Amino acid sequence: HVPYLAGYNAEVSEEEQLVAVIYTHFEPMALYAGTKTTLEEIAEGDKIAVPNDPVNENRALLLLQNAGLIKLPEGTTLESQCTPSDIVENQYNLDIVELNAELIPGARADVAYAVINGNNATLVNLIPNKDGLYVEAADSEAAKAYVNIVVVKPENADAQWVKDLQKVMHTQEVYDLIVNAGFAPTFTVAQ
């Protein structure tokens, strides 16, 4: 997604820079069941696993705030880099467990709830809009910011093969595949 690309480009040499050429779909981050199966079961001190990388951790904490479970400092946005130490209100005294995003699906047996990003959810057959207890909305700021992209080296941005790939990726078949996976296409079908 775009924030990840920005972070990547900030850390690599000019020769390694990449640019976005095709916008594909949004994979919502969601709060999933761990040892508890509904949000109505939430209790004092429950553990919630969140990704520990700066971009996804802030996004996960915003998701928990939007779900009404915590409060972050006023003015917190997707560009902020909040961590659990920034939580200003935690009515259930939740224990926020920071883990590598790829490990969270497998850690659900050890926590009450888990915040999992879309690509890691699909690896364990979780569909956000079906299995998520609380899901980022398809029309949210997160959906605009975290749209998945195809990237290339700048010199390839206008290459014919990129145009051909976009034409193939923006078909009705791909659109339907994305929807059936529980994600939100961010393109209109090419005519």
Indicate residue ranges for each PLM-predicted region.
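Short amphipathic alpha-helical coupling segments at ligand-binding clamshell hinges
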Residues: 44-46, 157-168
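Short beta-strand->loop
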Residues: 17-25, 97, 113, 123-142
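A bilobed periplasmic-binding-protein/Venus flytrap-type ligand-binding module shared by bacterial periplasmic
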Residues: 28-39, 146-159
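Short helices/loops that flank or line small-molecule/ion binding pockets
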Residues: 62-63, 84-120
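Ligand-binding clefts/hinges and TM-proximal coupling segments of bilobed small-molecule sensing domains
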Residues: 51-79, 163-191
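Pocket-flanking alpha-helical
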Residues: 1-14, 122-126
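A conserved helix-loop-strand patch within extracytoplasmic ligand-binding domains
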Residues: 14-70
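A local structural motif
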Residues: 44-45, 69-98
